[in-house]
């Protein structure tokens, strides 16, 4: 076996070629892992739970927490509920290590948490899957790599995970390079991350399709500066058209009210981000300090109460899941400020309770949902005739 490995090693060119080849392999493997994870979590579990009677929907997050915490406790071997933060932690270690045996544990715990209604996102387990795949390949082929290539493949794997789950390769690269805050490694990891993210994205969309993660944001009404109300648009089965002389009217100018709204939104988002960071740290501390049974029981009870409250207020248990349904609900022009503010409070409470109870998942999608709710609230508060503008701004 050693002779075979030596012969293969001689066939490979020196320099960056091995790490680039392994980055492509990482992206390919990660795409399959995340496609399976998303299908189980979103298309099978969460879709099934969402169609059940309210009492079953309300109880499901508690069952998911029980399963997730049990999986971590009995099969994790000292592994906690962390996902994307484990990637950052491993990156800063002298010898990064994410055991492959923990990967199925994290994915199953994440599927139980999110698929049964916990208010966390798919991106956390996806980043963990990518980082673990990258570092595992670097260990298997360490004789072909330089020592610093371990962190490079770790970063490339995380980029592949984000690129797949968000169907956005550029987002994957930016996240993976910025999250660890280490410029010298980021420069070396740029090209491998691009290779891994592109491979993961192309493979993933061929497996699951190109449906946007947040479909309504593709609507032109929610794009910056576009005002479809002022132009008559015709449409056919496969195209839309308008009078060329009306083209200038399609793009509205920036008004003083828009600038004030953007300033207000920036202040609110900044304050909210700082507050949320503190609350997340507090929730994770409670998860570590409180014993197994009380935190799962209280977490399930609180999530059930939040789901029932949301159903009473909005006609749907919008606290369930990562928050896509909540985003789709909040953009309706019929919703008043009071209901939008209530949804903001209920959603953030559900996310914090899921974390404190030991749920496994990411925070990016739930926080993006909070951003959409906050953007719509700001637009309605200042009486904007284009509240969708602030949904676009919050994603910038």
For every predicted segment, state its role.
Residues 1-394:
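Alpha-helical transmembrane segments and immediately membrane-proximal extracytoplasmic
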């Amino acid at each position: 076996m050693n002779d075979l490995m030596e012969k293969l090693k001689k066939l490979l060119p020196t320099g960056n070629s091995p790490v680039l080849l392994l980055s492509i392999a990482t992206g390919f493997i990660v795409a399959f892992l995340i496609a399976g994870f998303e299908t189980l979590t979103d298309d099978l579990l969460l879709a099934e739970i969402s169609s059940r009677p309210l009492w079953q929907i309300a109880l499901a997050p508690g069952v998911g927490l029980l399963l997730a915490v049990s999986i971590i406790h009995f099969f994790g071997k000292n592994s906690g509920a962390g996902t994307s933060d484990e990637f950052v932690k491993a990156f800063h270690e002298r010898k990064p290590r994410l055991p492959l045996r923990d990967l199925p544990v994290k994915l199953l715990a994440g599927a139980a948490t999110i698929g049964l209604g916990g208010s966390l996102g798919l991106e956390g387990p996806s980043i963990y899957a990518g980082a673990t795949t990258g570092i595992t390949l670097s260990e298997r082929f360490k004789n072909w790599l330089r020592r610093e290539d371990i962190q490079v493949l770790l970063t490339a794997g995380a980029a592949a995970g984000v690129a797949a789950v968000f169907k956005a390769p550029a987002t994957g690269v930016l996240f993976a390079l910025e999250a660890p805050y280490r410029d010298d490694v980021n420069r070396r990891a740029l090209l491998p991350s691009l290779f891994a993210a592109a491979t993961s994205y192309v493979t993933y969309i061929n497996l699951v399709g190109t449906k946007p993660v947040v479909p309504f944001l593709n609507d032109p009404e929610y794009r910056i500066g576009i005002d479809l109300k002022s132009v008559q648009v015709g449409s056919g089965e496969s195209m839309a058209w308008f009078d060329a002389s009306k083209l200038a009217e399609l793009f509205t100018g920036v008004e003083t009210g828009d600038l004030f709204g953007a300033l207000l939104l920036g202040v609110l988002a900044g304050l909210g981000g700082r507050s949320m960071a503190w609350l997340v740290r507090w929730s994770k501390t409670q998860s570590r300090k409180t014993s197994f049974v009380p935190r799962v029981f209280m977490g399930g009870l609180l999530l059930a109460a939040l789901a029932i409250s949301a159903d009473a207020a909005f006609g749907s248990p919008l606290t369930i899941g990562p928050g896509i349904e909540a985003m789709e609900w909040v953009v309706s022009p019929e919703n008043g400020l009071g209901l939008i503010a209530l949804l903001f409070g209920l959603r953030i409470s559900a996310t914090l309770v899921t974390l404190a109870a030991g749920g496994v998942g990411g925070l990016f999608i739930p926080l993006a949902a909070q951003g959409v709710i906050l953007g719509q609230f700001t637009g309605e508060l200042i009486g904007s005739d284009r509240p969708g503008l602030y949904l676009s701004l919050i994603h910038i």
